[in-house]
């Protein structure tokens, strides 16, 4: 049977000079679906899990550090002055990084033409971008404590250093999720002991890892493991506690802090090292599995907390929304931080 010819093609744009003339549906109405597909929310994971202090003015904040002393028996006739040893003092200083900003400009004419709201989503995205920058900076500082060269790796001699724990097998040998999960759990067993040997409190210990490592731990703790129900929630796929550590899943584990450009790493502060072995680097993007710490290991100093500002830009006939904060981030206690890394191949 011959094909029908001459029928109307109401959806085809047959205007003169149209480039996409082959699209037979071009003129049909595009009905608003009722939902704007916004980016999934990004959540800060470090804000409530490390030390945060606010200052009203100044460029930095001082954190005094005190050492330890020891007791000694005093025999009759001996002088305390002959036995006394001074308690050493030092300090850690966290400097404000500067004013971190994110903004968007909404033109009146485009806002009038648009048929769905964007302001609330734009505002959320601005706030999230600053929160992610703070997260990245804190996580990079944990890695930084692990990478300090030996002559600076303790606040005061005897207080302890950061702990870097290698897996027993290299990365290539740990492609199986269950095997990797068991390696991480074994490493956290060593991490627990290392922190306790440094007299780090048992409460407020956290292990940050990427989704692959988090899933590996889940796989190792699933129903074939003893007491799995006390450690994980199988329905939600979440981990409650492993070896005294709150396990936190972080997609942006190695992102680092913000820089001077909105894209790329130009002028980036709080850089997460890229490669192990460069200088004194023991923990880097190419070998890290996870970072562990006590909440006192890293600090944030706030000069200006996260705030939103709305301004009228009459010369552009537009509204501007600005998110901003002035904070600084830094390592405080090397003895309360550490990392789990893959064995060197």
From Swiss-Prot:
Residues 11-25, 152-156 are annotated as: Intercapsomeric interactions. Pfam families: Gp10A-like. Disulfide bonds: none annotated. Keywords: Capsid protein, Virion. GO terms for cellular component: viral capsid. GO terms for biological process: viral translational frameshifting. Its main location: virion. Homohexamer. Interacts with the connector protein and the minor capsid protein. Interacts with the capsid assembly scaffolding protein; capsid proteins and scaffolding proteins form building blocks that assemble to form the procapsid, each hexamer of the major capsid protein interacting with 2 scaffolding proteins. This is Major capsid protein.
């Amino acid at each position: 049977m011959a094909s029908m010819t001459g029928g109307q093609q109401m959806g085809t744009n047959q205007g003169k000079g149209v480039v996409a003339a082959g699209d037979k549906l071009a003129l049909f109405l595009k009905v608003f679906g009722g939902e704007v597909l916004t980016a999934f929310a990004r959540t800060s994971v470090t804000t409530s899990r490390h030390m945060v202090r606010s200052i009203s003015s100044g460029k930095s904040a001082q954190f005094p550090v005190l050492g330890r002393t020891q007791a000694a028996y005093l025999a009759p006739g001996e002088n305390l002055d002959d036995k006394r040893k001074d308690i050493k003092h030092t300090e850690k200083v966290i400097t404000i990084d500067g004013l971190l900003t994110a903004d968007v400009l909404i033109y009146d004419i485009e806002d009038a033409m648009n048929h769905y709201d964007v302001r609330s989503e734009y505002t959320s995205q601005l706030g999230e971008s600053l929160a992610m920058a703070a997260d990245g900076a804190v996580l990079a500082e944990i890695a930084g404590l692990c990478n300090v060269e030996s002559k600076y790796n303790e606040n005061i001699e005897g207080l302890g250093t950061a702990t870097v724990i290698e897996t027993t097998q290299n990365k290539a040998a740990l492609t199986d999720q269950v095997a990797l999960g068991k390696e991480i759990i074994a490493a956290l067993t060593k991490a627990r002991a290392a922190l306790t040997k440094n007299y780090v409190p048992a409460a407020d210990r956290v292990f940050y890892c990427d989704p692959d490592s988090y899933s590996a731990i889940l796989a190792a703790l699933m129903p074939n493991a003893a007491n799995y129900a006390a450690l994980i929630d199988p329905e939600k796929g979440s981990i409650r506690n492993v070896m005294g550590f709150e396990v936190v899943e972080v997609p942006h584990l190695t992102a680092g802090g913000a820089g001077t450009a909105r894209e790329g790493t130009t002028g980036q502060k709080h850089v997460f090292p890229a490669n192990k072995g460069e200088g004194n680097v023991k923990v880097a993007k190419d070998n890290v599995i996870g970072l562990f710490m006590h909440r006192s290991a890293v600090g944030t100093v706030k000069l200006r907390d996260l705030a939103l500002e709305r301004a009228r830009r009459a010369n552009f006939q537009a509204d501007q929304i600005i998110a901003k904060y002035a904070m600084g981030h830094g390592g405080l206690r090397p003895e309360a931080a550490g990392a789990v890394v893959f064995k060197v191949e």
